Amino acid sequence: MSEHDSDVIFAGSIPKLYEQYLVPSAFEPFAGDLVRRLQSRHLTHVLEIAAGTGVVTRALAKMLPSTVEIVATDLNPGMLEQAQSIDMKRPVQWRQADALDLPFPEESFDAVICQFGVMFFPDKAKAFAEVYRVLPHGGVFVFNVWDRIEENDFPNTVTKAIAPLFPDNPPRFHARVPHGYHSVEIIERDLTAGGFTSKPEIEVVTRESRARAPRSIAMAYCQGTPLRNEIEGRDELLLGDATVLATKALTERFGRGPIVGKSQALAVTVVK
């Protein structure tokens, strides 16, 4: 398996650590913002793709009327397992699905939503074409992507901190994948290639990421994301060392805790 193949694997202990450490600091601050972009619409069926451990699914369940049917999908069974272990307070249909080949008929959802998942799709235009296919005319696709890593304090600090462990080939997962798809021109191009003809609304959204202590963030990024696969692929014995280095760098920059850092994303809304 190549390094780039491991970019999309959220397995083993990653889903639990992801939910425990990464979701509260990185994803919860943006989940409500994304769902609010759907609230003014009359909806009956909503599809979530790349749902992960369900942080946006929980926001959908809380913020949308109880009459709206929610279907949540993810490529990784381990992430869905973790998501289903958390009470949603209302029925949600969970399905394993590849965003590049959605197992749903044409025009079957009023809206499709995706939080911080698009960056992982190997063929974004194809994924957008699948979203386009399952939406009716007037249906809406809302998603967000991380802005460049330099605008996001915690992953940027972690990425720089662990680089000296691997001087010949530093792990760049976060810069390459989660923070590697932020060009407005490229996003618009890929949406057009996927069939969308209306101009997307793209908004910069800035939030604060918070954690009780630097180690929580070090655990989140080093062990709760595919960066772990990248580190262990180089030397599995250095995962602990990488986490220690990241903790030290975060402590030096943000203090011993609780800590606060800037997070920035792009929120995209496009209508079929």
What name fits each language-model region?
Residues 45-102, 111, 126:
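Class I SAM-dependent methyltransferase SAM/SAH-binding core
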Residues 39, 65, 87-88, 122, ...:
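Short conserved AdoMet
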Residues 1-44, 55-59, 63, 79-86, ...:
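Conserved class I S-adenosyl-L-methionine
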Residues 61-64, 87, 162, 191, ...:
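Conserved hydrophobic residues forming the short capping helix/wall of the S-adenosyl-L-methionine
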Residues 125-126, 132-212, 228:
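Conserved catalytic/acceptor-binding region of the Class I
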Residues 3, 7, 15, 53-55, ...:
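Conserved Class I S-adenosyl-L-methionine
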Residues 104-106:
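Short amphipathic alpha-helix with an adjacent loop that forms part of the alpha/beta core around
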Residues 110-124, 147:
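A short SAM/SAH-binding and catalytic strip from SAM-dependent methyltransferases
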